[in-house]
Amino acid sequence: MKSQHQVVLSLGSNQGQRLETIIQCIDVLHLEVGTVLKISPVYESPAWGFESTPFYNCALVLHTNASPTQVLNKILKIEKRLGRVRTGTVGYAARSIDIDIIAYDEIVLDTEKLQLPHPLMQDRNFVLLPFRDLQLDWMHPIFKKSVPELIAETTDNSICQAVATIPAPLSSIPLEKFNYIAFEGNIG
């Protein structure tokens, strides 16, 4: 059994200070869910499925020892803390932050609360383009296609424009300045 799992999340915001909210969200995810390793560029894209102001979207990959359900529960709490209000009405709405689990390793899961991989990822450029930018060796476990293949086949023709970059939290540690790193503890 793996101790660390690779999780791809999609973040979106179309209310308030969109970029600042996404940056704050990434910091909280890094502290509370798992180690954020890579972050895609931030894209601006039109609202999908409803009329509203444009979204800022990005994808990130993190490593965690939490289960898919634990990750979901943590991100729902983070969304609420960052101002997300769920009305319970059917359909899409503007939001300060939206965090979706796109992939968890290459697991296929279908429960009432969580479906993996995200069941609409292949239909959304605002998910596919940032996911591609993570440059992961990932294959959709149901469609047996890579992210570039999914992009080539999507029917979504919405324009997504890269507008910003956000450094990953670990990028501020200058590892190249160290000759070695020692880890304390038992080996074996």
What are these regions (language model features)?
Residues 181-188:
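Glycine-rich phosphate-binding P-loop
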Residues 49-54, 72, 77-175:
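Flexible, gly/pro- and Lys/Arg-enriched active-site loops
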Residues 10, 127, 182:
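Conserved beta-strand segments that form the floor/walls of ligand-binding pockets within enzyme
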Residues 16, 102, 188:
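A short, conserved beta-strand element in the Rossmann-like catalytic core
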